[in-house]
């Protein structure tokens, strides 16, 4: 900001003589004309100062980097909300896999590393994840204006009226989430599933209502199809309502189609960005399943039988083989395989933020280190990874070209 002002002042000084000359020439002109010319000169001066300032100092309006932490910040879709490109999620961990003390350690490490995005949902640990997150925020006393807190609505309770995306549940569910979080508002409220039982207009009107009431700043979608997101946008435009700004989508080395083909088209057409989750594919990419399923792992839990079956399947074994082939690339870049996988997600310019899920401080610190790997993700490295994976999706435009 100081540099910008200095540049503006410099241009103003250089034009002092010209302005005096113009003022003398127009002394007899009507006041309206003088005011119009003065306004034009002011706009021209500002435009000129901005024009010289931007290329000289290489300002990026899309991405900025914190000097102290090295964390990068991007716009959430085409909204003005700036989010850290790495966020901390609370699924499985908060209120379940880890203690409250470890949860506080993780949030502290994340915040001190420049993370400003913390994501949760009403369904996580039956609301306990929101309670723990809220308790930690209150204890730490971090400035609310420095944080981006997001939550998701759909599965609220056992009653029919306590789930879905009806106007009733969106309003009551968000109010309950705010009570658990001990917050006046969340920055983004997500519709955690599409709801075929509720008209799209009702959903969009309810989301617009909670934003207008100050309960949320923005709203987004999670696990919605491109067609459903487009319908929500169309309804918002038709009735002068607020459209979604972001879609939460699963994205990792083995799940690419939606984020790399479908969402970019939505971003360019209607400004919807991508906040991605599970960059390590529920731990599959961490490397701990290379020789089977350890008893202490998530896949060994009864409620994660589906994950165990996925790992020991034929496709799962093929994925482990590909991960072993990727290891030399990670070694060459001086990073771990998880860091390579997270950096690979971040190299996608259409991704606003990648949500990390960690069960211990060491794991979180390792994953946050992906920021240092990001500059090394050259087109050559990305192509090398694509050749090993063999699953790069192609859009209709790619086929036509």
From Swiss-Prot:
GO molecular-function term, one example from the UniProt record: potassium channel regulator activity
UniProt-listed GO biological process terms: regulation of potassium ion transmembrane transport
A Pfam family per the record: Aldo_ket_red
Any GO CC annotation of this UniProt entry: juxtaparanode region of axon
Binding residues annotated for NADP(+), in chain numbering: 90-91, 97, 119, 192, 222-223, 248, 277-282, 288, 298, 357, 359, 363, 366-367
Location in or out of the cell: Cytoplasm; Membrane; Cell membrane
Recorded domain comment: The N-terminal domain of the beta subunit mediates closure of delayed rectifier potassium channels by physically obstructing the pore.
Family stated for the protein in its record: Belongs to the shaker potassium channel beta subunit family.
Function: Regulatory subunit of the voltage-gated potassium (Kv) channels composed of pore-forming and potassium-conducting alpha subunits and of regulatory beta subunits. The beta-1/KCNAB1 cytoplasmic subunit mediates closure of delayed rectifier potassium channels by physically obstructing the pore via its N-terminal domain and increases the speed of channel closure for other family members. Promotes the inactivation of KCNA1, KCNA2, KCNA4, KCNA5 and KCNA6 alpha subunit-containing channels.
Protein name listed in UniProt: Voltage-gated potassium channel subunit beta-1
Species, as recorded: Gallus gallus (Chicken)
């Amino acid at each position: 900001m100081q540099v910008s002002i200095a540049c503006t002042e410099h241009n103003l000084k250089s034009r002092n003589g010209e302005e005096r000359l113009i003022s003398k020439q127009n002394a007899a002109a009507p006041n309206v004309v003088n005011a119009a010319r003065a306004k034009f000169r002011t706009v021209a001066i500002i435009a000129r100062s901005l024009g010289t300032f931007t290329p000289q100092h290489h300002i990026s309006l899309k991405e900025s980097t914190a000097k102290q932490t090295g964390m990068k910040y991007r716009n959430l879709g085409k909204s003005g909300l700036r989010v850290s490109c790495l966020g901390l999620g609370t699924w499985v961990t908060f209120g379940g896999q880890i203690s409250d003390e470890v949860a506080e350690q993780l949030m502290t490490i994340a915040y001190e590393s420049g993370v400003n995005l913390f994501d949760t949902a009403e369904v996580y640990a039956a609301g306990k994840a929101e309670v723990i997150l809220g308790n930690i925020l209150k204890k730490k006393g971090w400035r609310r204006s420095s944080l981006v807190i997001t939550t998701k609505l759909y599965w609220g309770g056992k009653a029919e009226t306590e789930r879905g995306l009806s106007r009733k549940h969106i309003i009551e569910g968000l109010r309950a989430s705010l009570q658990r979080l001990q917050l006046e508002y969340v920055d983004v409220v997500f519709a955690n599933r599409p709801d075929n039982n509720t008209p799209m207009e009702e959903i969009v009107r309810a989301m617009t209502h909670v934003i207008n009431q100050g309960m949320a700043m923005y709203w987004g979608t999670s696990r919605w199809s491109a067609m459903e997101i487009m319908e929500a946008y169309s309804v918002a435009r038709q009735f002068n309502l607020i459209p979604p700004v972001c879609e939460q989508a699963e994205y990792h080395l083995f799940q690419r189609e939606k984020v790399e083909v479908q969402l970019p088209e939505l971003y360019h057409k209607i400004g919807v960005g991508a906040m991605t989750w599970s960059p390590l594919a529920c731990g599959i990419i961490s490397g701990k399943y290379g020789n089977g399923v350890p008893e202490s792992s998530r896949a060994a839990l009864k409620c994660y039988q589906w994950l165990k079956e996925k790992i020991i399947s034929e496709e799962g074994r093929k994925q482990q083989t590909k991960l072993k082939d990727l290891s030399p690339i990670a070694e060459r870049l001086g990073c771990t395989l998880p860091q390579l996988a997270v950096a690979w997600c971040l190299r996608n310019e259409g991704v606003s933020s990648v949500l990390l899920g960690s069960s211990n401080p060491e794991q979180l610190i390792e994953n946050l280190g992906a920021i240092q790997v990001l500059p090394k993700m050259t087109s050559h490295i990305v192509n090398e990874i694509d050749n090993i994976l063999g699953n790069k999706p192609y859009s209709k435009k790619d086929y036509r070209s």
